[in-house]
Amino acid sequence: MKAEAEIIFVTYPSPGHLLVSIEFAKSLIKRDDRIHTITILYWALPLAPQAHLFAKSLVASQPRIRLLALPDVQNPPPLELFFKAPEAYILESTKKTVPLVRDALSTLVSSRKESGSVRVVGLVIDFFCVPMIEVANELNLPSYIFLTCNAGFLSMMKYLPERHRITTSELDLSSGNVEHPIPGYVCSVPTKVLPPGLFVRESYEAWVEIAEKFPGAKGILVNSVTCLEQNAFDYFARLDENYPPVYPVGPVLSLKDRPSPNLDASDRDRIMRWLEDQPESSIVYICFGSLGIIGKLQIEEIAEALELTGHRFLWSIRTNPTEKASPYDLLPEGFLDRTASKGLVCDWAPQVEVLAHKALGGFVSHCGWNSVLESLWFGVPIATWPMYAEQQLNAFSMVKELGLAVELRLDYVSAYGEIVKAEEIAGAIRSLMDGEDTPRKRVKEMAEAARNALMDGGSSFVAVKRFLDELIGGDV
């Protein structure tokens, strides 16, 4: 009898990456009975001390998914590096984890060989953890990169090393309108919508180093769907054997309640009861993600914009935890009283339930890829307001490349400190909620197409089958 399979996930331990990786692991377990166990290796991050509790809560009802915590990294990079060049910090901290992963994997593989009933068949590696490819090679295990971003981002990662061979310097923000012929995009991509880290020397070098390791993987699993990014996936399908095959395995979504230390049941019930009382498609939801912290001046401009438009709204405001300020303290005087009949302000909302509600009509979003996929899944159009990471590129893709969103901003970066004025915000909200050009019908069509992709015979269903057949062998 052939031994059952164990797959090892090496996941970057930030909440967003853990959430998507664990959800993907759940989908594989549900899909294939030959998988005995998926073991997820993770380590502690100084900036995300609660991540391990979050991960445990996500797998609590999953006996075939096992979390394996690694020892603390010795001599981690200084936190100052994170605030200057986050991608450089992430890469350096991951490199320091390589010996710990090597020891853990060696022990796992040896113990499985001794048991004879279970075999480790390969690694699924978060794209921030690509230094682990060398460990997989040492143990003669295939490694697959799991990209929590989209195929457009992968196109950029393919382009970066090619550009670097010609021009070794980081990108220049002052040449923001210079366009790049990034493969997989129909539109040329302006410099100003590329990830902000590419304008900082240390982060730029980290991005290039990460991208240069991609060809060492046996395959790349992308959390996107063919019907959404047809041009990008077609481009990768045409590539020769010098680049790994690309598998569109998305959308990988966590559609059940996610635990949050900031939201108790009464808060959640208050929000959902309020939504029940609102007319269909009347609410604009404003949220910039768990890390989308905005200051008092920007909060005041958004508040003024909401009063200018008169639209009903649900506004989730994340404040700096070190300041211990309530979001209500930062609002203009009298705002809550003036908007009491039309709006609700909270510090955290159950986003999946909110987007699924019939009262939702639009979403002003930071364009984190998880949020984009969730909004598309529920057919809710977006107004783009990116903040950090690759969100500017996501916003560009949604507005210019795919025609699936309304532009508020494409190139906004929260770290630069610009204050977007109320009139501009109000204009985007009006376009989102009332405009004839809002791609509401196309978004609804994409929601249906994404669901079809996951069904038996759909593009993502077939891609996951190809991946599992290659990894485990035989028929699923």
Swiss-Prot record:
Coiled-coil ranges per UniProt: none
Highest taxon listed in the record's lineage: Eukaryota
Enzyme Commission code: 2.4.1.-
Binding site for UDP-alpha-D-glucose: 290, 349-351, 366-374, 388-391
Pfam families: UDPGT
InterPro entries, per database record: UDP-glycosyltransf_plant, UDP_glucos_trans, UDP_glycos_trans_CS
UniProt entry keywords in alphabetical sequence: Glycosyltransferase, Transferase
GO biological process annotation, one example: negative regulation of systemic acquired resistance
Gene Ontology molecular function: any one: quercetin 3-O-glucosyltransferase activity
Function: Possesses low quercetin 3-O-glucosyltransferase activity in vitro.
Protein family per UniProt: Belongs to the UDP-glycosyltransferase family.
Protein name according to UniProt: UDP-glycosyltransferase 71C3
Protein source organism: Arabidopsis thaliana (Mouse-ear cress)
